[in-house]
Curated annotation (Swiss-Prot):
Keywords: Cytoplasmic vesicle, Endoplasmic reticulum, Golgi apparatus, Ion transport, Membrane, Transmembrane, Transmembrane helix, Transport, Zinc, Zinc transport. PANTHER family: ZINC TRANSPORTER SLC39A7 HISTIDINE-RICH MEMBRANE PROTEIN KE4, ZINC TRANSPORTER ZIP13. The lineage of its organism: Eukaryota, Metazoa, Chordata, Craniata, Vertebrata. GO terms for molecular function: zinc ion transmembrane transporter activity. This is Zinc transporter ZIP13.
Amino acid sequence: MPGCPCPGCGMAGPRLLFLTALALELLGRAGGSQPALRSRGTATACRLDNKESESWGALLSGERLDTWICSLLGSLMVGLSGVFPLLVIPLEMGTMLRSEAGAWHLKQLLSFALGGLLGNVFLHLLPEAWAYTCSASPGGEGQSLQQQQQLGLWVIAGILTFLALEKMFLDSKEEGTSQVSGYLNLLANTIDNFTHGLAVAASFLVSKKIGLLTTMAILLHEIPHEVGDFAILLRAGFDRWSAAKLQLSTALGGLLGAGFAICTQSPKGVEETAAWVLPFTSGGFLYIALVNVLPDLLEEEDPWRSLQQLLLLCAGIVVMVLFSLFVD
């Protein structure tokens, strides 16, 4: 630069030209590599899309489609067992409940329902949960103390969840309180049907024969249980047809369970899910049996009627024992 006293200023122009040329060359290389990066990204995305389409294709293949149809039909049959009480409970039961004789007949049904609920929890749900945790143990060595404690915690979680729900939706009126107990029973039934859907679909994934046997076994087990649930809904203030429709709505849980089991396509995934769903459902049924049903039976002061209630409670347990023996 003219007039500048610095000795290095004369070299500033060539240095600036050199740095500019170097920057342009680097930008050119980077620009040339962008199509390659874009092509690599496109190829990766294509591979992911192909894998996803292959997984969906395997899920909806001919063999899987048969499993889908059989599992959904089996779960739907289990859900439709909620209509069975309409064939057992008299048509005039809804109007009879307002009379003293009708109230006594309802308490008889509730006694049987209480036995069925207790039998379902201690003879079916909890043993199934123990079996699932044993099969999930490494080497099939049985349950550890930690696994047993986890089962107990899930039972407590079910009880506390249903307690919280009843506290949230509890009405100050007695009628509202009864209806809340009915809806809680429907929630427990929906979760229970979810586990049935898991079992049905997992069995059909093995073979059609095992799937059919499992479906029939669950149907036989559910029939006395549905009668008890129907009695609980009648106690909650629903008429026969409303109770039947609400019972049928719980079949959605079975369809969801079947769909979940088929989508996972893994017996391990089904076992891990059932290992906590079953004890959680047990806690819900225990809450309904001991908090909503048992207090009604404790109000009875007549010794002869109290004895009849106790015998019907035992009959409900015996029926669940017999069905458990036949199923096993």
